[in-house]
From Swiss-Prot:
Zn(2+) binds at H174, H176, D187. Belongs to the UPF0758 family. It comes from the Bacteria. It comes from Streptococcus pyogenes serotype M3 (strain ATCC BAA-595 / MGAS315). InterPro entries: MPN, RadC_JAB, RuvA_2-like, UPF0758, UPF0758_CS, UPF0758_N. Signal peptide: none annotated. This is UPF0758 protein SpyM3_0777. A motif (JAMM motif) lies at residues 174-187. GO terms for biological process: proteolysis. Residues 103-225 form the MPN domain. One of its GO terms (molecular function) is metal ion binding. NCBIfam families: PRK00024.1, radc. The keyword Zinc applies.
Length: 226
């Protein structure tokens, strides 16, 4: 098995990282550091290059199962688990780094922040952002995971947290795992229902946003409901 240390003709990724910083490394080199060793056929840099060449984008890593990663990269289960764990950790770091504490200005700002967290989920998630009277998000609450159709029919829990936290307004977001962001008839019905229910309680429903891993649909921007 080829190690990351075996190439004497160039400065290897670890040494480049120590000398120049992680930001100076290519995707191939960063992945090689995570892989550490190659397989029987390929040096670790060749293996990382091969793996990247079979992906449309780095985001595809999040969508791959352990079995798919093992098969494509020709690596063992332990190494595949380590890579998946690192990918999840990076995802959580990004989500933390993009904590929604600033004032909300546009739907696209919200969508870009939430897409990183929800875009690759295999199940549908319904998330609500609760805002104060200065349009600052003070809480992000996952209301439901699983069959969003069932959740979309019942806004009671959404409004419970709004009243409990004395929210002035809220934004509803859910993902479409299929990647198709076009709203269904059920999405339209739910949006009308939650908007009416919010108005009855003096709470403003600012938007209902549907996200995928690369795009979003804003009812405020594209529908006549707002």
């Amino acid at each position: 098995m080829y190690s990351i240390k075996c190439d004497d003709n160039k400065v290897m990724p670890r040494e480049r990282l120590m000398r120049l910083g992680a930001e100076s490394l290519s995707n191939q080199e960063l992945l090689a550091i995570l892989l550490r060793t190659g397989n029987k056929e390929k040096h670790v840099l060749e293996l990382s290059s091969y793996l990247l060449s079979h992906l449309d984008s780095l985001a595809d890593f999040k969508k791959m199962s352990l079995q798919e990663l093992q098969h494509l990269a020709g690596i063992g289960k332990v190494k595949a688990i380590e890579i998946k764990a690192m990918i999840e950790l990076v995802s959580r770091i990004l989500a933390t780094d993009k904590t929604l504490t600033d004032s909300v200005l546009t739907s696209v700002q919200v969508a870009e922040k939430i897409m990183a967290a929800l875009g690759d989920k295999k199940q549908e998630h319904l998330v609500v952002l609760y805002l104060d009277n200065q349009n600052r998000i003070f809480e992000e609450k996952t209301i439901f995971i699983g069959t969003v159709r069932r959740s979309l029919a019942e806004p009671r829990e959404i409004l419970y947290y709004a009243c409990k936290n004395m929210a002035t307004s809220l934004i509803v977001i859910h993902n479409h795992p299929s990647g198709n962001i076009e709203p269904s008839s059920n999405d339209y019905c739910f949006t009308e229902k939650i908007k009416r229910s919010c108005e009855d309680l003096g709470i403003i429903c600012l938007d209902h946003i549907i996200v995928s891993y690369k795009d979003y649909y804003s009812f405020r921007e594209k529908s006549t409901l707002f």
